[in-house]
Design a protein with these regions (language model features):
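Compositionally biased, charged N-terminal/linker segments
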Residues: 1-50, 147-148, 155-160
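Short, conserved beta-strand edge motifs with alternating hydrophobic and charged residues
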Residues: 9-11, 56-57, 68-70
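Residues that flank catalytic or metal-binding motifs in active/ligand-binding sites
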Residues: 6, 65, 101
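Mixed-charge, low-complexity intrinsically disordered regions
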Residues: 2-14, 74-77, 121-122, 126-160
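Short, charged beta-turn/beta-strand-edge "cap" motif at the junction between a beta-strand
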Residues: 57-63
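Aromatic- and Lys/Arg-enriched surface recognition patch
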Residues: 68-138
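A short secondary-structure junction signal
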Residues: 20-22, 81-82, 116-118, 151-154
Length: 160
């Protein structure tokens, strides 16, 4: 069971970092930094593992699931927390007891089109999905296997 991949969804504002930005990077891989919510941090630090599958979700504009990624590293301390030049700088985070963590994510596939929320709401398998619950704002969310498979099947059927 320890080697069984888990499933996640990460949110990003395309104006800050989009799936196209990820696709343009060497190895199509990036550190997923700047998470400053404790529950989201706990997912990154305590639960995400290399090989887990991740949906890349665009928020604010072009809202929806834009593609599929994978976790490409084990969790490690977010270096931006100690960089005073970075907008994610946290002066209260000691170097010997990091407060914030990251994982690297690698692009697996950009979907032919972003799958919007209103379409996700039509899939019965997603009735209990965290993303679709009122007030759900967490930037890192777990996804149940059935939800993951339903979205992936929909994306492949709709966006080959």
């Amino acid at each position: 069971m320890a080697n069984t991949p888990r499933y996640w969804l990460v949110k990003s504002e395309p104006g800050c970092f989009s799936i196209d930005d990820l696709a343009a990077l060497p190895g199509q891989t990036s550190m997923w930094d700047g998470v400053r919510n404790y529950q989201a941090r706990n997912y990154l630090r305590d639960s995400m593992k290399r090989g887990d599958r991740v949906f890349f979700y665009h928020s604010i504009t072009g809202v929806g699931i834009a593609g599929l990624c994978e976790v490409a590293s084990e969790p490690y301390p977010d270096p931006t927390q100690w960089n005073p030049e970075d907008r994610h700088f946290d002066p209260a985070s000691p170097a010997d007891a990091p407060r914030w963590y990251v994982v690297d994510i690698r692009l697996v596939k950009k979907f032919a089109r972003t799958i919007p929320l209103n379409e996700l709401r039509t899939l019965p398998e997603l009735a209990e999905m965290e993303l679709l619950k009122r007030g759900s704002r967490l930037s890192v969310q777990s996804v149940r296997e059935g939800e993951f498979l339903a979205i992936l099947a929909y994306a492949e059927e709709d966006c080959p």
